[in-house]
Amino acid sequence: MATLSLHSHSFLLVLLPFILILRQNLAVAGGCQVPPVIFNFGDSNSDTGGLVAGLGYSIGLPNGRSFFQRSTGRLSDGRLVIDFLCQSLNTSLLNPYLDSLVGSKFQNGANFAIVGSSTLPRYVPFALNIQLMQFLHFKSRALELASISDPLKEMMIGESGFRNALYMIDIGQNDIADSFSKGLSYSRVVKLIPNVISEIKSAIKILYDEGGRKFWVHNTGPLGCLPQKLSMVHSKGFDKHGCLATYNAAAKLFNEGLDHMCRDLRTELKEANIVYVDIYAIKYDLIANSNNYGFEKPLMACCGYGGPPYNYNVNITCGNGGSKSCDEGSRFISWDGIHYTETANAIVAMKVLSMQHSTPPTPFHFFCGG
């Protein structure tokens, strides 16, 4: 017992500086006098309950155990990066667009992200193109209701709200990861990347034509470091930190293309503010320097089945019968083999808010409403 207490004390000493920095960033950015409107498009990295609302899919405890003390449809033990970013702007956590039970709680925007989403094929739920069409319907309906009923005007987002909103895009991971899972070779996966980039570019241009001017684009993380991938791929092609080199190489190529796309769009869309965020660098740093952050076994899931080295079994995933979760998720980077723990998400958010990984460097409170 004494050993456990000492270990916990040491861990808190390691983590405390990051918690304090995050709180400081939240306080500075949280000075928004007018909370912003935010629209998010993405996959499970930023899904705040869309899959549950849209398909009735059950995501139960232990998901959500550390912050919400209940399952919210998020694939984590607590908050996601997008939740911390919303809190930094002093706005409510985003509700899923498909959640019909939240009443008028779309005044600060909506979240179109859904678990498993990709950019291609375009018309398969819930691809980026489908999410975009949902947004266009949402906008049309909101403006219609605001125009015909005075009582509803206070609850609806108006033209200025859509024009000044922040449009966040975090998608592409599944396009790459699923291609590998289907048995495609590295060269074939790489050939798909330009098409994925093209879909994201098209979405931004459509949003721009609809009046959007503020865009926040996340690249994809180190796919080769996910316990899920590591447990399912029999390969000797590991990098020095134990990650799958080919998966990470493909992710880097995708990120390079996404960066170039953002640079091109800044030239093409003269009035747009487009911020590119290097999530890959942030997340890989957590893996490479896990001890500095107080994490144990950086390539092992907290919740899953099978034990070391990865604690992931595709037939017994987190939350399903037979799976087990660790006592302290704060000591793990990976929650369920694919998604991050709240502690890891908090550190990622802190580093995002630092502007050190953003191009161009932009304080997040730039997106305050007004």
Swiss-Prot record:
Keywords: Glycoprotein, Hydrolase, Lipid degradation, Lipid metabolism, Secreted, Signal
Pfam families documented for this protein: Lipase_GDSL (PF00657)
UniProt key word Transmembrane helix: no
UniProt subcellular location: Secreted
Membership in a protein family: Belongs to the 'GDSL' lipolytic enzyme family.
Gene Ontology terms for molecular function: hydrolase activity, acting on ester bonds
Cleavable signal peptide: 1-27
Glycosylation sites: N90, N315
Lineage: Eukaryota, Viridiplantae, Streptophyta, Embryophyta, Tracheophyta
GO biological process: lipid catabolic process
SUPFAM superfamilies cross-referenced by the UniProt entry: SGNH hydrolase (SSF52266)
Descriptive protein name: GDSL esterase/lipase At1g09390
Enzyme Commission number: 3.1.1.-
Species the sequence originates in: Arabidopsis thaliana (Mouse-ear cress)
InterPro entries (UniProt xref): GDSL, SGNH_hydro_sf, SGNH_plant_lipase-like
Enzyme class, first EC level, given as a word: hydrolase
Entry keyword Hydrolase: yes
